């Protein structure tokens, strides 16, 4: 009787774990979490010296060969964006779209995101700090080989910023 009870308990506790160990990992060669974590750590170190004050951002934006990238959705970009910024929505960042938009990987690119502005929640909805679009955009550009990337650092009020913010007129349908 004791043996039967012991055997039953072993089956109850051991069998579920045995099955879990034999389940094969789901592999997708187009998704590389370990590579992403590695490149993110590398980009994070590189990024620290490339965060700009508002004045530095304005000064750099006026220099020849510098472009401003707005990676928010086209809708949010149209509502309000930094004057002269180019819109390339984050989900649309690919090898092809980057080649088309920034053919020179050595071009200086300035980035900003929702979490750089307060006072206009509709065009600049706040994201969780760890989900800031600046972080994703910086890592993506770094992953594709763009190294001359700078990020607007501070949180600015749209009412007091020295950056010129404009709307894109919508075409009439």
Regions found by a protein language model. Give the residues of each.
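Short hydrophobic beta-strand that contains or immediately precedes a catalytic carboxylate
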Residues: 67-72, 85-88
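Bacterial N-terminal signal peptides
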Residues: 7-16
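Short coil/turn segments at beta-strand junctions that form active-site/ligand-binding loops
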Residues: 64-69, 105-108
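Short, solvent-exposed loop/turn elements at domain surfaces
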Residues: 59, 76-79
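Positively charged n-region of N-terminal signal peptides that target proteins for export
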Residues: 1-4
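Short Gly/charged-rich anion-binding patches and loops
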Residues: 56, 72, 136
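A short, well-structured juxtamembrane/interface segment
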Residues: 46-60
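Rhodanese-like catalytic fold shared by cysteine-dependent sulfurtransferases
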Residues: 18-48, 78-82, 86-88, 93-173
């Amino acid at each position: 009787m004791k043996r039967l009870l012991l055997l039953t308990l072993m089956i109850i506790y051991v069998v579920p774990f045995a099955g879990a160990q034999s389940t094969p990992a789901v592999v997708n060669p187009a998704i590389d979490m370990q590579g992403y974590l590695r490149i993110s750590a590398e980009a994070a170190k590189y990024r620290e010296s490339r965060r700009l004050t508002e004045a530095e951002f304005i000064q750099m934006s006026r220099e020849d060969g510098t472009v401003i990238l707005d990676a928010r959705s086209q809708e949010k970009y149209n509502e309000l964006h930094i004057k002269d910024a180019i819109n390339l929505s984050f989900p649309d960042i690919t090898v092809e779209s980057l080649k088309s938009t920034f053919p020179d990987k050595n071009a200086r690119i300035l980035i900003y995101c929702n979490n750089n502005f307060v006072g206009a929640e509709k065009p600049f909805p706040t994201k969780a700090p760890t989900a800031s679009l600046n972080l994703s955009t910086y890592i993506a550009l770094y992953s594709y080989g763009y190294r001359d990337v700078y990020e607007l650092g501070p949180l600015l009020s749209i009412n007091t910023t020295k950056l010129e913010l404009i709307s894109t007129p919508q075409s009439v349908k």
